[in-house]
């Protein structure tokens, strides 16, 4: 694994520069290090180059102005990363909120997208805009709920939620938190998360689907079997040519819960588009 800064983002990378590129964008609050199990598998089994940035305001990447957290603006940030790294086209893999960014990237930069792989994301609806201040207040309440008395309490909660625990998972999940006032709290502040939620509401996913469909881009949606049925059906209706697969007994964080299944499904899908 290599790490570096490019286009004002902190980036984790696995694989060789000359191999077909994959950009992984993690979920809300997460970092590129969340790909530390699937990244090596995509390299070893499918010969891919995996780049996984910390989104602005996450991990080791600095926050930006509130308007910069709209998904279309974050897609532009990903395009800037491509340009700085000399990557012309890549498969965009988005987990959870990262799926929103992935969809907007594909809608705006069709010529730079070889495939779109969405993992438990890119298919959820959006609430009506509440205004930035209200969105930040909501995020502050959620952040307090996600704050723990210490690392042991945080790791125990994560291990129980994910139903598995490894040194790689501990490393990845530690990277999203920091010590704050004697407790362990998310690195992503309420201001960052509130701006993201407001941006998602101002730019609903449905607005990006027509451009993706018109471009004929190959699309994969991998969901937990218990994922919202209505959301999946709306996604199928909007993008009828998309490939949709479900993971039995899965949870929302499929990247942590079933890394081998995610890497195998995404890797095969990306390889088919070469």
Segments predicted by a language model, with ranges:
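Gly/Ala-rich beta-loop-alpha elbow adjacent to hydrolase catalytic centers
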Residues: 94, 98, 102
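Catalytic histidine-centered segment of alpha/beta-hydrolase-like enzymes
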Residues: 250-259
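Conserved alpha/beta-hydrolase catalytic His-Asp/Glu region
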Residues: 148-203
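Conserved serine/cysteine hydrolase catalytic core
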Residues: 181-238
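Flexible "cap/lid" loop of the alpha/beta hydrolase fold
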Residues: 107, 114-149
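Conserved HGGG/HGGXW glycine-rich cap/lid loop of the alpha/beta-hydrolase fold
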Residues: 10-62
């Amino acid at each position: 694994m290599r790490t570096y800064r490019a286009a004002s983002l902190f980036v984790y990378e696995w694989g060789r520069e000359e191999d077909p590129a994959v950009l992984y964008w993690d979920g809300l609050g997460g970092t590129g290090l969340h790909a530390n199990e699937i990244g090596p598998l995509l390299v070893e089994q499918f010969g891919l180059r995996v780049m996984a940035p910390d989104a602005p305001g996450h991990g080791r990447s600095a926050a930006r102005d509130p308007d910069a957290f709209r998904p279309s603006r974050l897609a532009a940030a990903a395009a800037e990363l491509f340009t700085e790294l000399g990557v012309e086209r890549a498969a965009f893999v988005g987990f959870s909120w990262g799926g929103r960014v992935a969809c907007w990237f594909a809608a705006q930069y069709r010529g730079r997208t070889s495939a779109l792989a969405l993992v438990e994301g890119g298919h959820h609806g959006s609430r009506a805009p509440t205004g930035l201040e209200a969105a930040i207040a909501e995020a502050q309440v959620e952040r307090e709920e996600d704050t723990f008395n210490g690392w042991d309490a945080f790791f125990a909660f994560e291990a129980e939620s994910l139903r598995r625990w490894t040194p790689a998972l501990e490393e990845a999940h530690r990277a999203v938190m920091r010590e704050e006032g004697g407790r362990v709290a998310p690195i992503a502040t309420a201001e960052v998360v509130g701006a993201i939620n407001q941006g998602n509401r101002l730019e609903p996913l449905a607005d990006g689907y027509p451009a993706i469909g018109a471009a004929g881009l190959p699309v994969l949606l991998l969901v937990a079997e218990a994922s919202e049925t209505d959301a999946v059906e709306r996604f199928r209706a909007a993008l009828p040519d998309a490939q949709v697969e479900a993971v039995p007994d899965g949870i929302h964080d499929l990247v942590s819960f079933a890394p081998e299944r995610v890497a195998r499904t995404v890797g095969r899908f990306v390889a088919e588009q070469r």
